[in-house]
Amino acid sequence: MIGSVLYLVNSQMDTLSIITWLLVILPFPILGTLFLIYTKQDWGYRELKSLIKKSTQAIKPYFQYDQRILYKLKESHARTYNLAQYLHRSGGFPVYKNTKVTYFPNGQSKFEEMKKQLLKAEKFIFLEYFIIAEGLMWGEILSILEQKVQEGVEVRVMYDGMLELSTLSFDYAKRLEKIGIKAKVFSPITPFVSTYYNYRDHRKILVIDNKVAFNGGINLADEYINQIERFGYWKDTAVMLEGEGVASFTLMFLQMWSTTNKDYEFAPYLTQNFHEIVANGYVIPYSDSPLDHEKVGENVYIDILNQARDYVYIMTPYLILDSEMEHALQFAAERGVDVKIIMPGIPDKKVPFALAKRYFPALLDAGVKIYEFTPGFVHAKVFIADDIKAVVGTINLDYRSLYHHFECATYMYQTDCLVDIKADFKETLKQSRRVTRSTLQKEKISTKLIGLVVKLVAPLL
């Protein structure tokens, strides 16, 4: 037990994670220590970690880093320049101009545009999604993919291994292969070896011909387009990139794909064959990996909060915070920044929702304004600040996204779509009820007790 305590105290874990593990180990020293070893040694993921490391190094030289663009950004906004420098150093991610960004305020609008763009594909289609479920949405997309295969377009589909326990059969990848689609399962679940929840591919990426890319919270299942109802109205968001910035998503996909077959052929898919797009602002697509000690997703969010002067508006389905993120939210509000958070009115998971409410009192006391979307569930992951910067992607405000999953997002500075993002937030706000100390007191006792108990193990959720 002493060895376990020494390991925890000297680890790079955040304070709450260390406390959580101590609460597990102290009353149950043998079982707790074995569980710690099981989760931290990653026996089922050592090969994956090695492959990810190799593919990450292999792909870095292909990121086209234009120093001139960076200098222009420095001249217009030094603080955003500093963040761009960080993203380049942490993952090699370049900053782009000449990239048009279109914002979608719901799954329905994204779905319609996806189909239009898929039908235009001439060379390749790459899809990487956390959830794919058979139904109207996936059925229509699959029909287009089959058509494109017949036309000679290379189609690749990759989905997370957890789907084999939920929405897709174990042989689904083989079924796709039979119709000419190259298919991969990322990190299949291995009983008693996989930790199940860790190292999941939570990313959502669609790339077409290195010309167009989609990113955001919307998976390929019918609830995301409100074709079926789950937890009321499903509020989600996405962005479409056209132009130079698409290359980063092409490379992100190829990097993850290569972990399953060590195929490091990247250059043929990076041909710049699109008409030059003139667009305002700067775009930085980026990803985050749980296999290093760099919390890229969280660091970007915290930077937005720390640099904000007027407002930060946030949409997130979950709110399970480490001390750094909680402090950043509080400090921004205490500095006079208008911090607003919209969360679900109807949660998809009751325990995490009860846990989120344990963070509400301290945030409210600091001046953070919290709202719940009354028509249903908010699955969007959006930050927008001061009319000049925003992030749309897959990164939730919880430990799973910030520490344990593979994620991706699009950082935007002074792009034209910021107007649409802010307008959508305000429209969503009109459909939301404000949370106050008074409303929290009216919560069910069971909800309060669940949140109180579960907060002790928040980092494990």
UniProtKB/Swiss-Prot annotation:
Stretches assigned to the PLD phosphodiesterase domain = 197-224, 374-401
Q: Which GO terms describe its biological process?
A: cardiolipin biosynthetic process
| Species of provenance | Streptococcus mutans serotype c (strain ATCC 700610 / UA159)
Give the bilayer topology: Multi-pass membrane protein
Protein's name according to its UniProt entry: Uncharacterized protein SMU_988
Output the InterPro entries linked to this UniProt entry.
Answer: Cardiolipin_synthase (IPR022924), PLD-like_dom (IPR025202), PLipase_D/transphosphatidylase (IPR001736)
Q: Name one GO cellular component term.
A: plasma membrane
Q: Which UniProt keywords apply?
A: Cell membrane, Membrane, Repeat, Transferase, Transmembrane, Transmembrane helix
Q: What Gene Ontology terms describe what this protein does at the molecular function level?
A: cardiolipin synthase activity
Give the family, as the similarity comment puts it: Belongs to the phospholipase D family. Cardiolipin synthase subfamily.
Q: Where are the transmembrane segments?
A: 18-38, 124-144
Q: Which Gene3D superfamilies match?
A: Endonuclease Chain A
CDD domains this protein is in? PLDc_SMU_988_like_1, PLDc_SMU_988_like_2
Q: Where in the cell is it found?
A: Cell membrane
| PANTHER family recorded | CARDIOLIPIN SYNTHASE (PTHR21248), PHOSPHOLIPASE D (PTHR21248:SF22)
